[in-house]
Amino acid sequence: MQYYSLGKQSPNVNFKTAAITGQAPDKGLYFPAEIPQFTAAQIERFKTLDKASLAFEIMKPYVGGTIDDASLQQICAETIDFDFPLVPITQNILSLELFHGPTLAFKDVGARFMSRCLGYFSKQEKAASASSPIASPIASPITSSITSPISKATPQLTTKSTPQVTTKPTTVLVATSGDTGGAVANGFLGVEGVNVIILYPKGKVSPIQELQLTTCGQNITALEVDGSFDDCQAMVKEAFMDGELNQQYNLTSANSINVARWLPQQLYYFFAWQQWVKQYQDANGNYPAMNIVVPSGNFGNICAGMMAKASGLPLGHFVAACNANDVVTRYLATEKYEIHQAIATVSNAMDVGNPSNFVRIMEILQNNFTNLTHALTSYSISDATTKSTIARVYKTDNYTLDPHGAVAFAAAEIYLSQIKAEKNNRDIINADTSDTNNINNTATLNNPHSKAIILETAHPVKFPEVVEEAIGEKIAVPASVEFLLDKQKVSIPLAANYAAFKQWMLQ
């Protein structure tokens, strides 16, 4: 498998180079040259595979021989070594709980897969270095925001040099508002040949999130920045552009622009589908369309799901549930893609004014706006509705949503109610014969076949102020993170300016 840059000005690379460098030299995101296509027979076999075996089958084409099968099987098994239950909330809306990993957030999957891949590559390079007196040069990765999701060019090779890997230890720089840093810290903890530096805004993460960032030790360093998340992110971006730092460090990113973090997010869509089929398939092999509502900020999560569908997984319609940061919602309504400064909301992980992964969604859909409108619906949910949804669902359905899940739940209700009036619908899929790219998922709200799942991306305990105010009760701390409460945070205070950060890096 080769990967090309969506900037169209860099040479193709393999998975290893794409994972280590993060972005292409032309600042574009990497995209697989081919989307694997699973046959109907393979899809049928996927119904009964265990999670680890299924994960291996899905990820093997993307890795493309850069990791041997035995090692990839181990990486996949360790990546998904926790539950992904599909839990009913109402008759028509189910929750895919993605918070049963070590840091209680969906980002555990991508972070664990990426960390183990980089660890594998580090050992591989170390072994190669021991047998060769000449080390390879390194082309430093460069990061930049994506300014437009629309590109009609086809991938081409250029004469520019291909990024090379090196035996120099990899340094992962991460700016976080909470969940990303915790997942990356846990995923990379103890990984040989990889150091992680996390920048987080002082006083702007929850107590549990901060403990997840600051109590790891070993190869994880937490910098407590006296500023905002935007300050942290700006410093990380400037570091990737700094030639002096890149001479000393082999820098890479661990957010969803990196293919090793983005692509494994497909896995839990397959896991959800397995459970869906087991629960709803009838004797003739038919089952309701699994419409999917995803809380969306940077659009990496929903993009991974759309990749799964493009590879042949029979999924229903996708709904992007957004907060006040509604760039994509407005784009679908107006065909005008207008980025803006991020707006602060109670669903803060979705506070993104320029979603970098949307360009990948457009690539999946051949950069065609009509294709986009057929494949994706989007709604913008206010903070007031988010809070009232948490309260209402807790009271009526005895289910505790986090703010991001509440945005998704509210969007799911809107979607199901809007399709209620549509007629001549087709809401049953035959998994063996249906063209799932053209499913018209329209059914009445009270029809048991009209259903949707929401992705519950984080445990509500990570957002105690919003959730506890809404439900009027304290949230029980899960045993998996309760041990953190007895730990002492270890962080390095840092001023919110790049000069201070660079000085610390070079000392």
Name every feature range the model reports, one short phrase each:
Residues S434-T442:
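Intrinsically disordered, low-complexity regions enriched in glycine and serine
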Residues M1-A130, V165-N430, N446-Q507:
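PLP-dependent amino-acid enzyme catalytic core
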Residues Q156, T444-N447:
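Acidic/proline-rich low-complexity IDRs
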